[in-house]
Design a protein with these regions (language model features):
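Exported/periplasmic ABC-transporter solute-binding proteins
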Residues: 1-36, 40-51, 58-61, 65-69, ...
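Periplasmic N-terminal soluble interaction domains immediately after the signal peptide in Gram-negative
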Residues: 74-75
Length: 245
């Protein structure tokens, strides 16, 4: 009898590495995995409305914790980490040292993802709050100018086969985009002229990714969740630039 595919919902930033991990898991166990990717907050809303996810890998811990608090999902486990980087156009002369000046420059278009819908947007606003501790008035300026270009329910989708952030930057929608370092690395591979700038320590924001399994899901759900914490999957995540839990 053919096993039903395991329904795994995962943050968009996990697309490449989860596709690889799922393929390996299927080859090893025979368990088919159906992957659904998107902004974590939007996925959480879809799950709350009754979609059939059995494993949820979020780019934060708050969204899976909300599901757990409602009772139908297990408390989340942090399974991997990420951090914010600045993805910039070739002509932007940004360095870690002058990044805040660059972000505050009125002539620089600053792109982010959408807070609440996508944790990447929430992390950008956390960076803005840190900027306020470095320079008075920075939060208000950044909050006012930031363009929420991705991750929302109505955000334009890139053409098939294109990465969201590389496409947004190639279209010239932003001069600087605050996104996960893993996304920035992938975007640079797609559009080599783009530059990746590390965020200085005073502004750095870490992202803890939470993993949860639906209560009553088949045993294969817990098996896959445990596999994500095991050395082979952790090595794959590290290859894509993610940090250890």
């Amino acid at each position: 009898m053919t096993k039903e595919p395991l329904q795994v919902y995962a943050a968009g930033s996990l697309r490449e590495v989860f596709t690889e991990i799922a393929r390996e898991h299927e080859a090893r166990t025979g368990q088919k995995i159906a992957l659904t990717f998107g902004a974590s907050g939007l996925l959480r809303e879809r799950i709350e409305k009754g979609e059939g996810a059995q494993v949820f890998a979020s780019a934060d811990t708050q969204h899976p914790q909300r599901l757990a608090t409602a009772g139908a999902w297990a408390p989340p486990t942090v399974f991997v980490r990420n951090s914010l980087c600045a993805l910039t156009q070739a002509g932007v002369n940004a360095t870690p040292q002058n990044l805040l000046d660059t972000l505050l420059n009125p002539a620089v278009k600053l792109g982010t993802s959408t807070p609440k819908a996508d944790p990447s947007g929430d992390y950008a606003w956390e960076l803005f709050r840190k900027a306020e501790t470095v320079r008075t008035g920075a939060y208000a300026a950044l909050d006012a100018k930031a363009l929420q270009l991705t991750g929302g329910p109505d955000s334009p989708k890139p053409p098939a086969g294109r990465g969201t952030y590389a496409w947004v930057m190639e279209q010239g929608q932003a001069d600087v985009f605050l996104t996960y370092c893993t996304n920035a690395v992938a975007s640079q591979k797609e559009v080599p002229r783009l530059k990746l700038v590390q965020v200085p320590a005073a502004l750095q924001v870490g992202a803890a990714y939470g993993l949860t399994v639906k209560r009553g899901a088949p045993a294969s759900a817990e098996v896959f969740a445990q596999a994500l914490l095991a050395p082979p999957a952790q090595a794959a995540l590290a290859r894509y630039g993610f940090g250890q839990p």
